[in-house]
């Protein structure tokens, strides 16, 4: 039986990766395959093509509005979001074979642990449920932001009609085009282009981010299983006792290697996610403060909310891996180490020294942690106030 068939059968059984499989299918990508053999490339082209082309009018708009803080902040918020999505798409394409291989590798490790220690199933199920709940919440928040973006122009039209003002056709995202957008025959296809670009930006971001959730929660499951096996390690003495300890330490080592591998592949993305999200929160937060309580501010509120949630979840994933890796060290002290034989105690001492060094997900200058999240939010609020003073 092929790895792909095994993976699909196991997915049907434990119901993990459901959200990830769905969002990747929406982009025409088969997450179970390390190649494009089972993809629908036409769907990927139809979704990502408009987003790549959409960067041109947005860059032109950023240049056009360079002296207008309000319009520039609106334009740059969308531009940075699109740029980040394109980076995520290219990152997945470049590392696809490794990511898919890592999925099978993690699932094989966990399946083997269930055979060795049946109680591991409960830990794995809890972590996968948390992953799916987080991925589903994340999907809903980003979907809501996309819906608000599509509806934003109609809110302006309705308000203009109620006030009796002249109707001015607007787009979900600012851009500069070589034709008059007030002409309906030009406006409609451009609006659809904007909506398709929004769909691509939201869905591709969900693909790569939700896959990170799967990796982090399952690595945490490996660390937790290693901790519980360590706590319940019997003090039987002799070679059998030492062999049992070695098996647990090997499992912990696998978790460390996978965590380091994930951190290495996601390092550029973590850096851009934190850096660009901080800039986006500044610019879009300025729009919220400038427009509130205008109904059009609902879109920007949803946008800022999705940015904060994305930043929070990245920080939470990094914090979870860090805590789980350190928690394994606590498990070493909860064992019956006083009853172990001298060779086992010596091995346990070395393991305790290594467990003091946590796994960290870093994006060069940024560590994915709750402390970094708090710092960015506090700094963003200060910059929003500064932008408001420029616009006063």
UniProtKB/Swiss-Prot annotation:
Its main location: membrane. Keywords: Cell membrane, Membrane, Olfaction, Receptor, Sensory transduction, Transducer, Transmembrane, Transmembrane helix. It is found in: Cell membrane. Interacts with Orco. Complexes exist early in the endomembrane system in olfactory sensory neurons (OSNs), coupling these complexes to the conserved ciliary trafficking pathway. Expressed in olfactory sensory neurons in the antenna. It comes from Drosophila melanogaster (Fruit fly). Residues 63-74, 163-202, 290-297, 384-392 are extracellular. Belongs to the insect chemoreceptor superfamily. Heteromeric odorant receptor channel (TC 1.A.69) family. Or1a subfamily. GO terms for biological process: detection of chemical stimulus involved in sensory perception of smell; signal transduction. The chain crosses the membrane at residues 42-62, 75-95, 142-162, 203-223, 269-289, 298-318, 363-383. GO terms for molecular function: ionotropic olfactory receptor activity; odorant binding; olfactory receptor activity. Odorant receptor which mediates acceptance or avoidance behavior, depending on its substrates. The odorant receptor repertoire encodes a large collection of odor stimuli that vary widely in identity, intensity, and duration. May form a complex with Orco to form odorant-sensing units, providing sensitive and prolonged odorant signaling and calcium permeability. It holds the Pfam family 7tm_6. It comes from the Eukaryota. Residues 1-41, 96-141, 224-268, 319-362 are cytoplasmic. The atypical heteromeric and topological design of the odorant receptors appears to be an insect-specific solution for odor recognition, making the OR/Orco complex an attractive target for the development of highly selective insect repellents to disrupt olfactory-mediated host-seeking behaviors of insect disease vectors. Odor-evoked OR currents are independent of known G-protein-coupled second messenger pathways. This is Odorant receptor 9a. It is a multi-pass membrane protein. One of its GO terms (cellular component) is dendrite membrane. PANTHER family: ODORANT RECEPTOR, ODORANT RECEPTOR 47A-RELATED.
């Amino acid at each position: 039986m092929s790895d792909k068939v095994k993976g699909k059968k196991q997915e049907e059984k434990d119901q993990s990766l459901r959200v990830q499989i769905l969002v990747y299918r929406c982009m025409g990508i088969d997450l179970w395959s390390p190649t494009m053999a089972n993809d629908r490339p036409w769907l990927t082209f139809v979704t990502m093509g408009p987003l790549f082309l959409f960067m041109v009018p947005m860059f032109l708009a950023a240049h056009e509005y360079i002296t207008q803080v309000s319009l520039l902040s609106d334009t740059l918020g969308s531009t940075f979001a699109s740029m980040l999505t394109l980076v995520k798409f290219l990152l997945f394409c470049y590392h696809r074979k490794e990511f898919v291989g890592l999925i099978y590798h993690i699932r094989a490790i966990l399946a083997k642990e269930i055979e060795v220690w049946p109680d591991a199933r409960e830990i794995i199920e809890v972590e996968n449920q948390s992953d799916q709940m987080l991925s589903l919440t994340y999907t809903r928040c980003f979907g809501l932001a996309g819906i608000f973006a599509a509806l934003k122009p109609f809110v302006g039209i309705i308000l203009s009609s109620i006030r009796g003002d002249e109707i001015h056709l607007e787009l979900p995202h600012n851009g500069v085009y070589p034709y008059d957008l007030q002409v309906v025959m030009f406006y409609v296809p451009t609006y659809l282009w904007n909506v398709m670009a929004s769909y691509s930006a939201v869905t591709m971001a969900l693909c790569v981010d939700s896959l990170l959730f799967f990796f982090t929660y399952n690595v945490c499951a490996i660390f937790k299983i290693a901790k519980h096996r360590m706590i319940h390690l019997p003090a039987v003495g002799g070679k059998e006792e030492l062999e049992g300890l070695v098996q647990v330490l090997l499992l912990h080592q696998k978790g460390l290697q996978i965590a380091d591998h994930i951190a290495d592949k996601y390092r550029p993305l973590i850096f851009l996610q934190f850096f660009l999200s901080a800039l986006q929160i500044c610019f879009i937060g300025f729009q919220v403060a400038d427009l509130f309580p205008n109904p059009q501010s609902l879109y920007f509120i949803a946008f800022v909310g999705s940015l904060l949630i994305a930043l929070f979840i990245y920080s939470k994933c990094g914090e979870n891996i860090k805590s789980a890796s350190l928690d394994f060290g606590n498990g070493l002290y909860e064992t019956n180490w006083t009853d172990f034989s001298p060779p086992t105690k010596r091995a346990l001492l070395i393991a305790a020294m290594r467990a003091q060094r946590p796994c960290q997900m870093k994006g060069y200058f940024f560590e994915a942690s709750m402390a970094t999240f708090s710092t960015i939010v506090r700094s963003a609020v200060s910059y929003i106030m500064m932008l408001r003073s420029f616009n006063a």
